[in-house]
Regions:
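A short glycine-rich, Lys/Arg-flanked "PGG" loop and its adjoining helix->strand segment in the class I
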Residues: 129-142, 149
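Conserved SAM-binding loop of SAM-dependent methyltransferases across substrates and taxa
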Residues: 51-63
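Conserved alpha-helix/loop element of class I SAM-dependent methyltransferases that forms part
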Residues: 22-40, 57
């Protein structure tokens, strides 16, 4: 098996969430490599950075200048630190913040972030509008979204109740279940457009491994929003 994450196989062990290396390699090609122009030499914000897989990919693979990762679960941040030490990532090129995404984004100084990675997050929140508004407010020019979606051609967001106990679920410090939602692809596009981002859907190319067939089924989409 070849691919970016095959060279850094620790990421197949630091999380049980979508950590199949074939899927990670596909997502690297599809999300990171195809948007390298929005990452190379940029300061990047990684929303819900999990075990640091795409923070690392942005730095080591795409050539980002600096990446800030925000992750609510301290146990995952501890794993990131060990992984980055093992792979000798320069400490001056990244920062991980343990905290609530919405609270921490609000603290970021305007104009300090070029590109935001919002990967695997917008179907674990009922606050999509608020997040994109906050990213726009702090001056983020490029937003790369990768999300599960409901399959409809309407701009719908489906509310749901989601557990909070597993790393694959929405985070909440005090409640075992909270309100969450899953958007449609068109809803995501309209949310980005509302704040002045022109949108492009990134369609999957090449061989899609069995562990990433959700992209082929259009149950998951990648959308890039850019402000000119």
């Amino acid at each position: 098996m070849t691919g970016f994450f095959s060279k850094y196989s620790r990421f197949g062990e630091t999380s049980e969430v979508a950590s199949d290396l074939e899927r990670l390699n596909f997502r690297y090609r599809h999300v990171i490599e195809r948007n390298q122009n929005l990452l190379a030499g940029k300061t990047v914000l990684d929303i819900a950075s999990h075990d640091g897989r795409f923070t690392f990919a942005a730095l080591r693979g795409a050539g980002a200048k600096f990446v800030v990762g925000i992750e609510a679960r301290a146990s995952l941040v501890e794993k990131v630190k060990k992984t980055f030490t093992e792979y000798e990532v320069a400490a001056a090129t990244y920062q991980f913040i343990t905290g609530d995404v919405f609270e921490e984004v609000a603290k970021i100084e305007r104009g300090t972030i070029d590109t935001a990675l919002v990967l695997g997050f917008l179907y674990h929140t009922a606050r999509q509008y608020e997040l994109i508004s906050s990213l726009s407010r702090i001056g983020v020019m490029n937003i790369i979204v990768d999300s599960n979606v409901i399959k409809t051609d309407k701009p719908y967001i489906l509310l749901k109740v989601e557990g909070t106990q597993n790393d694959s679920q929405i985070w909440d410090a005090t409640r075992p279940k909270v309100l969450s939602s899953i958007p449609s692809a068109l809803a995501l596009e309209l949310l980005l457009q509302e704040f002045g981002y022109s949108t492009t859907r990134i369609e999957p190319e090449g061989d899609i491994p069995s562990s990433a067939k959700d992209y082929e089924r259009k149950a998951r989409v990648t959308i890039v929003g850019i402000k000119n």
